[in-house]
Amino acid sequence: MKSSKRKICQVLALLVSSIGATAAMAAGPVIQGGGSSLVAPTLGSVSNTATEIGLYGTANATFTYYSVGSGAGQNAFLNNQPTFFGAGVTGTVHFANSDAALSTAQLTAYKAGLGTTSGPLIQIPYIVTPITVPVVNGPAVTSTTTPQTTPGQAHSIALNDNDLCGIFSGKLTNWNQVVNPETGSAYALNAPIKVIYRSDGSGTTELLTRHLAAVCTTLNTQTGVTFVDSLTFTASFPGGAVPANFVAASGSGGVRTQLANLSSAGTSAVAYLSPDYTNTFLAPSSTVVTAAGALQLPVASLVNAKNGAYYAPTYANASTALGTVTPPTTKLLASNPANWVPNAGNPAAGYPVSGTSQIILSQCYANASVKSAVQDFLNKHYTNAGFVSIVHGNGFDTVPSNYQTAISNDFLSNASGFNLDIGNASVCTGTVTGR
């Protein structure tokens, strides 16, 4: 009996020791953020080491990301209101990701309000992204010159700005109205086109409409439609009313689901998505499209009107579209979050619908462990080879090297001497207690 009791005690001791070790491994604060569904598969979760949060682990902190769309992410951060992430979410909003830049009005209001105690807001580019144009049950690909965009398909259907403006405004509603830029003639396919658009506040929408606002005219756009750079797709339509062939979907996942359903039904459809929701040619490591039986969405190549070249929506072509951009070089310029977002609405070269997705942070955090973990995570995101591999595997590119250097010198350290770095003691003091 005594021997049995000793064995039970030994087992209990091992269990307690194991629990203690697990707790130690998961030491540190919970850091939560959310927003852009575009970057959600890249950020991921602690349970998936093929994502940034999973690769980071839980030794210093546990990061949690809610995929709710860029608009909701912005609102969550600007108000420090976690219910924008979900009805039952509580605690502090430590960061947000948004493909759309914050407006001047949003930045001004934050500075005058929550920023007085939380500290200055930081907005920096997180990744470079193309916005793809998936096409299901579209015209047969007959080209021998357009680039590959889809697994098992050497070439792609091609679209130009007139096609994009016509389709996304409702002027062109059948493939036999859409002109093939290679031949100058309409596609032969007689099939009505469904257009899938984001119903939520979407940075993916903002990147698309930024381009459409730059290139669409009264000649190639449906009467009454004027594209505006907005997170809300319907903002470009009179009274917010879209044509009957348009179908709303919430989140990038919702758009993909609609396309998959229409593909199975034999219905032709066009949409806009980040590469990680499309196929494994563009995003070979995406957790969305690597699952067994996952649909590989066909994607169009686009003509760049400035140089006449056809581009696939690869991360390299998105970086080409960004061009030679320079980050802010003085303290006055660098202290304005609006100056950190490059504009590639109508690029001279590269894939025409490209841009950056941003991460939004606070300069001051009340918990020193949160501050340290946020800095550590961002350092790894921008410089660690494993993190870079995850970014590329989801179809995105890292920000230009001059931006990486400036971000490191200005925000992740104080090498620049601008006192903009996270947790700077001369800023995060007194009534500025941090969030």
Model regions and ranges:
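Flexible loop/hinge segments at secondary-structure junctions
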Residues: A26-R435
